[in-house]
């Protein structure tokens, strides 16, 4: 009853202060409104309080000590342990070896060579008597750079894993008292970041058994089970074999990619483009007769959601309305036709969540299609000539277009006019592609160049030259390091974005390259060509000599079939390669 009365008073005061227009009047009161707590919350708070505090941490923050202090603090700890006759000192002595190794590695990374040599020459002798430690100590002598550490398996294992040291609870408290007695920031940093102290609780006396209330003498006769030795946490031999196996798999040739081919048969109108949605549920194709066709790739049929206005069914007052059978519409269809353009459709792009579709056409317009109602909801205009290509930025914030008017343009979905115009090419902009971070836009042109633009500033930051024909396709690696370009010169060029230079040139196709895509791990790139083939390249390493047909040695697979034209290739997240193309049935005469 008293609690309810207190809450009523607080609410009354809060209402009064609000009426008087005091700013944030209920802020202090809200802090005291919680007067009850569940049993689970109380138990969690007690656990946090018991497990936190100075007794359970070595250092609250890894402070940075001067390199000269490494030698001073380590020498002080060594002298403290060797000069003491306490049993705790003998138990803490094994901690000196990992401390020495980690301090030496830190000095190699952050200090001059003279400081490293002074630290090593002063303390390394105390560890040479132990055969297991001697090997690592001798390897430290030849370690001078971070590259030396990374190339050494045992030293790299120290950085990749925490060294485990077991201490009794009394010895652990003994060590903590020493660390708190003086300036030992370098030691605290190593203990916090690189060493795991496995503290073994001290055995309780008979008096502690009774006082704790957690057990009784009748149950265990005052005896605790003996400590069972736990298995070795770090088996160097097994760890070395495992990491060597991982390295062989990573550096070895990749496994062949699984391909799923979607073929178009007997297209009455010329098929210009085809694309599969990111969720692999829809296939969109643009035709010369200005229509876009959508197919469902799943067993579920395409069904239109109800929309407010249907312009194809506007009734006048004089019309005689008859009941229509909408059973077919409710059941859905396997294909939908989107009409709205008045010229050939050259490119289509799905949004990242597959909720919408963008298309561009010879009619100089870009249209947005709602894939819920399968209707055209937005018309974007700004180009003065046909629009050849589209691309949507990651997370579907912006989209870009390339046109016959020699410009690329940046758009947002909520505005029907372009936000940026990228001018600089001397001929048509045939393809556009966003960088994975959305800050850059790449464009390929008929003028045989590739340009990289700052999406926000609108200026050109890279110019890549070397193609001998129009550039028809672009692709960024998912890690953002490389840009691939290809076109009518039948060569695939890989550019290093950081240096702005050519990284690799891949040869093998015998006709125009029309589509490029990177694998999710940026290790493979697939290319589609009008020579009716799909080729997969491993851009990381070269494993064998060049094939007999003159292709580059990076080629790992060639896929051909009954195709007259391959339209696009798309890598999915599961490393599945989706291919779309046109297949004509053989006719016997």
Swiss-Prot record:
Q: Where are the WD repeats?
A: 266-305, 340-379, 382-421, 424-463, 466-505, 508-547
- What cellular component GO annotations does this protein have? cytoplasmic ribonucleoprotein granule; nuclear speck; nucleus; SAGA complex; transcription factor TFTC complex
Which residues fall in a coiled-coil region? none
Report the GO molecular function annotations. Answer: transcription coactivator activity
Keyword Transcription set for record: yes
A Gene Ontology BP annotation from the UniProt entry? transcription by RNA polymerase II
Q: By what name is this protein known?
A: TAF5-like RNA polymerase II p300/CBP-associated factor-associated factor 65 kDa subunit 5L
